[in-house]
Amino acid sequence: MLCHPARSRLALATALLLAMASPAATRAEYPMLMSLQPVAAQLGQTSENTVSSRYNLYGAYQVLVSGSKVTATVVAVPKTKDGKTPSLTSLKLKFTVAADALPGVRDFRLATPRGASTIGQIVIVADPIVNETGNNNSTSTAQNITLPATICGAIEKAEDVDVFKFTATKGQPLSFHVRSQRLQDRIHDLQKHVDPILTLRTAAGTTLAASDNYFFADPFLAITAPADGQYTLEIRDVRYQGNSFWQYSIQSHNRPVIETVHPLAVATGTDVLLAPIGHHLGS
């Protein structure tokens, strides 16, 4: 019986691929980046951030960051005494951000002996980074912060509620921009994503504002402080779920926030007066 030439070639190619595959090759998984802690870095500063992954990061030798004026290096890992290759699923990176770098979200990858990693993301911000610390799961144990700041933390376990307190004066504009769920869109192997909700309360516990899904699933609040005094800001998952990979940043300040402009289109060769649309823009 004659054998079809195309089928013969396909069978031969399959056999060659199977023959080339070895246990060593199947173990060389490229790293899948899962989170960065803290997930933000400040303009004009150098910071150490811890990246976590599935599969081994040992031997990572280069960090590739999108855009310009943001660079990163791998913090050296001591060699093991027995000479064996350790299984390393977290690594410290040193990010250096120029003072005139463009704020916003940057992609980054790690180059490793097992190939390039999946994409991670870092938020470049103007204000100082404040990291979540200690037990801040209730109003009575709320973490004290000073605005402006970018709050970084994680909704790391079930029923985790992170509460922060600050003072404001009557008439002071306040805005709070959460980045969390949107940062998870690039995570290759995260099976369930965060759904954060943000709530602003008075010292007496009265809810002034709450936001759930403003920018996709991420909250945003803009409000004017109704009185002098202390306020609390609470972030949690709307389902009270948690995961150590669910990192967040909350840009908290009193500056104007522009969301868009009108009109969105401008014809070439014409002068157009653009009107900003957003929050706390004044008159």
Indicate where each model-derived feature is located.
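Bacterial N-terminal signal peptides that target proteins for export
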Residues: M1-A13
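Bacterial N-terminal signal peptides
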Residues: A11-S22
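Boundary at the C-terminal end of the N-terminal hydrophobic targeting segment
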Residues: A24-A28
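Acidic, Ser/Thr/Pro-rich low-complexity intrinsically disordered segments
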Residues: E29-K81, L88-S90, A99, P113, ...
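Short, well-ordered beta-strand segments enriched in hydrophobic/aromatic residues
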Residues: L93-F95
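A short beta-strand micro-motif common to beta-rich folds, especially ectodomain repeats
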Residues: A101-T112
